[in-house]
Amino acid sequence: MAENCTLDSEQAVLLFKEYNLFITAFLLFLTILLQYGYATRSRTIYILKMIVLWCFWPLNIAVGVISCIYPPNTGGLVAAIILTVFACLSFVGYWIQSCRLFKRCRSWWSFNPESNAVGSILLTNGQQCNFAIESVPMVLAPIIKNGVLYCEGQWLAKCEPDHLPKDIFVCTPDRRNIYRMVQKYTGDQSGNKKRFATFVYAKQSVDTGELESVATGGSSLYT
């Protein structure tokens, strides 16, 4: 007969005492990721957070498979199968949507597990600036401050006000949302037009094109 491997309270306490430093460091690591892992705060920590979130799905699937192999009882086996199938379908669905988005915008932000949209600004100097965005807004307002372009609070690139295009884009797996510049404000209180600039882009149209084809003429808003 197989031995019962359940830990008693004394063994659990001893195990915690032995690994408490590791547990403390691991919890601190997760706390820093969750609290400071935003694209507007630290791009490095944010990317690390995305990697950790991505690893959770394979980990869930692996634990689910183990639960199916070693179920506590019949009810536990049924629950383990349902949860494992759900985890597998969710992970496959994530990859399908991410690959569709990558095909549309050619940005690694397509694999961001926190979002299903990527913003793209094709500067007139040839640079392409991509940024993570949680949803598809009606208005975007990128700014240039001291020669640096920001959008949605994220540092994108060094550029001049004249480098901003007439249209910018927010891509989703099935749509390309096109934003047209409707207003432009340049200059600060000192009159320096290169130091600060604000641009207002309003949602103009929606189509199913990719960023390689930027023709927007004749597109209606919900085609």
UniProtKB/Swiss-Prot annotation:
One of its GO terms (molecular function) is structural constituent of virion. Keywords: Glycoprotein, Host Golgi apparatus, Host membrane, Membrane, Transmembrane, Transmembrane helix, Viral envelope protein, Viral matrix protein, Virion. Residues 40-49, 97-223 are intravirion. One of its GO terms (cellular component) is host cell Golgi membrane. It is found in: Virion membrane; Host Golgi apparatus membrane. The keyword Signal does not apply. The chain crosses the membrane at residues 19-39, 50-70, 76-96. Residues 1-18, 71-75 are virion surface. Its main location: virion. It is a multi-pass membrane protein. It comes from the Viruses. HAMAP family: GAMMA_CORONA_M. Component of the viral envelope that plays a central role in virus morphogenesis and assembly via its interactions with other viral proteins. Belongs to the gammacoronaviruses M protein family. Homomultimer. Interacts with envelope E protein in the budding compartment of the host cell, which is located between endoplasmic reticulum and the Golgi complex. Forms a complex with HE and S proteins. Interacts with nucleocapsid N protein. This interaction probably participates in RNA packaging into the virus. This is Membrane protein. It comes from Avian infectious bronchitis virus (strain Gray) (IBV).
